[in-house]
Amino acid sequence: MEIWKPNVTVAAVVEQDGRFLVVEEETDDGLRFNQPAGHLEKGEALVAAAAREALEETAHHFWPEFLVGIYQWPKPGSDITYLRFAFGGRVDGCEPERKLDDGIVRAVWLSLDELRATRERHRSPLILQCVEDYIAGRRFSLDLLRHYDA
C-alpha cells in the first residue's frame, strides 16, 4: 500500500509601508503572483526554508519572526495537496545583482487593493488568505515549531 504524502511548502508574508512582497512567476497557467515560497528541502528547518526561499526568489534577506498560519490546500484537478507554513517577518537588506530562481520574472511590492484586484492571477487562493490573516493579526510564536536534527 502506497502512503500518501502532502507537499510541504513555506511562504514569506512581508509588509513594508503598506505593500506586500510578492513574486511574479512563470507557471503552466501563465504568469502568476505568489508569495516568496517553495518546498521544504530534506533536513531543513521550516524557518530556515522560508528565509532561503525568500532570498532565492526576491534577493531580499527575510527574517521570519512569527507564524501566520498553516494551510492545507488540495490543488484542483490534481492529486496534489499542499501543506503551507506561512511566516511573517521583515526584510533587511537586498542583493539587487543576485540572479532570481528559474521561473521568477520579478519581485514586486503590491498593496492589499492591488492583491485583491489581481486575485485571478494568483497561483493559489492561499496568497490572499495568508495576507488577510496577517492583516487580521494572526501571529503565532516560532516556539510552536520544533526541529530535530537527525
Language model: regions and residue ranges:
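Conserved N-terminal beta-strand and adjoining loop/helix that marks the start
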Residues: 1-21
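Short, solvent-exposed loop/turn segments at secondary-structure junctions
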Residues: 4, 30, 71-75
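Short connector loops at helix/strand junctions that flank enzyme active sites
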Residues: 7, 15, 35, 62, ...
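Conserved Nudix-box catalytic region and its N-terminal flanking loop in Nudix hydrolases
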Residues: 16-56
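Residue-level detector of high-confidence beta-strand sites
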Residues: 23-25, 70, 85
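Unchanged
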Residues: 40-63, 73-126, 148-149
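Conserved S-adenosyl-L-methionine
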Residues: 65-69
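Charged phosphate-binding loop/patch that engages nucleotide di/tri-phosphates or the phosphate backbone
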Residues: 129-150
